[in-house]
Amino acid sequence: MSLGVALAAQNLVVAADADLEPLPLKLPIPAFMGTPTDMPLGPHVEPPSDKPRAPFMAPKGVKNVAEGKKVTSSDKNPITGELSLVTDGDKESNDNSFVELHRRTQWVQVDLEKRYKIHAIVLWHAHNTWQVYHDVIVQVSDDPDFIEGVKTLYNNDIDNSSGQGIGKDKEYFEDYQGR
């Protein structure tokens, strides 16, 4: 598991729809080259698209509040990289741009240090190889122990193998656009 994350947020009053604009995301260079030989499709896998995804709409002036913030993880000794790479803003797929966690259910937690109204969460797994990402769960909470007030925003765990409930979101092919 390798990833990076961007959280766009502000701590202002909710803006009117007229004040929304596309979230300014600087996407990394597409890293996967070639044609995949095995495309595992099925009812739980979102087919890959050759079109750009629709922009996230957010109030003017939002910023990445996760950038540079402290990251903790269930994996205390990543295979490659440091946990700080999760929030350093670098979304490229070269060897110095990501942290790789050991295979098994893992989590990362970003401490935003204060409460924000979050408008978008964008994350990147490794996007230099063709693979489907399973059991991706995004949760937020004001509780640092994630015991109370936990809200699940995304869950594609179709069999509850991560123990966080069965998700309704689809598994997906990672690409340079993130998720």
Segments from the language model and where they lie:
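Bacterial N-terminal signal peptides
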Residues: 1-10
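N-terminal pre-domain segments of enzymes
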Residues: 12-62
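Trp- and acidic/polar-enriched beta-sheet ligand-binding modules for extracellular glycan
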Residues: 17-34, 74-76, 98-107, 115-116, ...
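Predominantly extracellular/luminal regions of secreted and cell-surface proteins
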Residues: 54, 58-90
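Eukaryotic beta-rich interaction modules
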Residues: 89-94, 102-104
